[in-house]
Amino acid sequence: MSERQPQILDLEQVIKSKAGKKAKYIPKFVINWFKKFVHIDFINEYLKEGYVGVEFCENAVKYLGVELEIAGLENLPKDGRTYTFVSNHPLGAIDGVTLGAVIGRQYDGKIKYMLNDLLMNLKGMAPLGIPVNKLGGQARNLPKLVNEVYHSDNQMLVFPAGLCSRKIDGKIQDVEWGKSFIKKSRETGRDIVPSIGPDHLYAYRLSAAFR
């Protein structure tokens, strides 16, 4: 069990840090609106518990009241090797915490994600993440960080679309997947294990209501 790290997330500071010199142009009411939009009080109530790593994911699932129906768990490899687990991305952040909870528990917490760098502000998620900037240029050391993880003893969790699923021609589907995970998996001798989350309209609309 990891040592707990209770946290109160200062969302205003996160926004200002991300915006840099442009922060002074962001009206206060916009920041206040965004706090309500992301339910920051609800988030901070959970962050006070201080869960870290896979425990953060597992308890976030419980806190959100999500009931998981998992099929094929018995098929997960248990041969001591490392794998690349790939998944569609229909529901947003909840995809990450649920996949992390399930895969992380099966592999003793030895998992890593490619994470939106904003999520690295969550102490509980940060140890699991490789930060990816969705709003600007990438850090120069990103290729090095990715390479290190693929060569490590961690299981790699990847959402190849890089974005949440979209409604396209009346169907909920991922945008085109990036292929770098295939190249890196080949280079490091990792087999790729696919998984799939709910892609029906009801789940999509429900998740969209909370985005």
Task: Put a short name on every predicted segment.
Residues 81-87, 154-160, 190:
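Generic beta-sheet signal
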Residues 144-151:
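Short amphipathic alpha-helices and their capping/turn segments at secondary-structure boundaries
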Residues 155, 162, 166-211:
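A cross-family acyltransferase "interaction/gating" segment
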